Amino acid sequence: RKNHQQNLLDRGGGCAACHLQTHTDSAHPALTVRVDNDRCFGCHSRSGRISLNYVGLAETEKYDQKNSANFGKLADGRLVKKLPLDVHSKAGMACIDCHTVRGVMGSGKRHEAQLDIQCTDCHAKKLFRKPLSQLQAREALYSALYPDNFHTAVNGSIIVSEKNGTPLFHLWEENGGRFLKGKISGKK
């Protein structure tokens, strides 16, 4: 057994890269679907660097000694400049609060544009819905595993992504308002 501490230098493969929880040498590892942002950061702070932007960092090669408080170094030695947090990060949301299982895990086929979620899936005037009776087995399994994140609304339907009809179990409308429950934090 090896201690599986996820950090910036980790770029694992397969299911364990994201779903293996941190454990001590004496504990048996456990799996989770509540994948925290550190798991995303190991891979997604490179190339597209979306994880850096999310937490208010930008990779740079220039260092301004007069404003040294605005700079830092990552564990792998890269120089970063501190910037404002992404609005979703500032609100305390996790990466998986927006990114769906279909967008992250895929459909088993290669796609040019794998991303499932769009801003309008939460922020459009009228959201897309799917009747609960039309949930696929994989989709129904998630609602069974995490019933606290499962919200229904109008006539037994669920809000879904426009692109692929992926259920957004943690998003609902109530009394004229729209709410999202954090998949990790559980906060509304």
Task: Locate each region found by the language model.
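C-type cytochrome heme-c attachment and multiheme electron-transfer modules
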Residues: 1-24, 31-188
